Amino acid sequence: MLSLKLPRLFSIDQIPQVFHEQGILFGYRHPQSSATACILSLFQMTNETLNIWTHLLPFWFFAWRFVTALYMTDIKNDSYSWPMLVYMCTSCVYPLVSSCAHTFSSMSKNARHICYFLDYGAVNLFSLGSAIAYSAYTFPDALMCTTFHDYYVALAVLNTILSTGLSCYSRFLEIQKPRLCKVIRVLAFAYPYTWDSLPIFYRLFLFPGESAQNEATSYHQKHMIMTLLASFLYSAHLPERLAPGRFDYIGHSHQLFHVCVILATHMQMEAILLDKTLRKEWLLATSKPFSFSQIAGAILLCIIFSLSNIIYFSAALYRIPKPELHKKET
């Protein structure tokens, strides 16, 4: 019979510094794991196991919702629903890519960086999907058919390209300038989210307009709260920073961050679905639905330029002398 032995785990002082996580002392996988060992680690309690499953399981939930929406939509003729389908598709992509990144990030130093480059690209693709759905369904009455609305998605595309580049670049600073690395990475994700959310901020805190005063408002509020909590957890490394070694396997900040992000996405999806349904008559009377070329063009530009960023920075990994990128790893 075929027997598979679970890989050995390591402590923080047994692996190169590039694999270190703040406040996490034990449960590390071999820094040159095989693909098979990485897959087996899904069924072994390591410090990455729950990072993987907290996005892999939600991927199947969001995929089920996406397939259900596809089945119930007349895709060819219902252009009003296209932005929602694009958004739901991107909400499947980012948790899948994230779970794959966490699964295979221990294959080598460069593989770790490349895995997370792809992760950052997927997050930014989701950011663009959110912007497309917001533009189609959630904009407050006063901002519809304005210059801001006209250029909102175009600038969201630009934001995703810049954000992917900045977040990828930040990984080159991890060892030598960890604080600057963290600041750049947080800002790289914070400003696209802020741009995407401007119509929501206006709607919640200034003037929603008659058509936007509906049941979706509470979901938008919950989405914002969960996103702020996720941002705090990602930045603060709590609770493991206060008690190193106590939360290595269960309860560290990245696991909690994943849970908050998934809950935020769920709340966001419910809000957008409600806006799409409850505001349909008003929106169709006020503005034209996105054309296929507009949606496809935005998505393709995001994918092409984000992949270009990822390829450029991946190639740079092999051009930089090892002592420069990992010089403190001794």
Curated annotation (Swiss-Prot):
Function, in words: Plasma membrane progesterone (P4) receptor coupled to G proteins. Seems to act through a G(i) mediated pathway. May be involved in oocyte maturation.
Cytoplasmic side, ranges: 1-51, 102-113, 163-186, 275-294
Expressed in which tissues: Expressed in the brain, lung, kidney, colon, adrenal and lung.
Gene Ontology BP term (one): oogenesis
Signal sequence bounds: none
InterPro entries: AdipoR/HlyIII-related (IPR004254)
Membrane topology label: Multi-pass membrane protein
Entry GO MF terms: signaling receptor activity; steroid binding
Keywords, ordered alphabetically: Cell membrane, Developmental protein, Differentiation, Lipid-binding, Membrane, Oogenesis, Receptor, Steroid-binding, Transmembrane, Transmembrane helix
Keyword Transmembrane carried by entry: yes
GO cellular component, one term: plasma membrane
Bilayer-spanning residue ranges: 52-72, 81-101, 114-134, 142-162, 187-207, 254-274, 295-315
Location(s) in or outside the cell: Cell membrane
Positions on the Extracellular side per record topology: 73-80, 135-141, 208-253, 316-330
Family: Belongs to the ADIPOR family.
Pfam families linked: HlyIII
Note: Non-classical progesterone receptors involved in extranuclear signaling are classified in 2 groups: the class II progestin and adipoQ receptor (PAQR) family (also called mPRs) (PAQR5, PAQR6, PAQR7, PAQR8 and PAQR9) and the b5-like heme/steroid-binding protein family (also called MAPRs) (PGRMC1, PGRMC2, NENF and CYB5D2).
Annotated protein name in UniProt: Membrane progestin receptor gamma
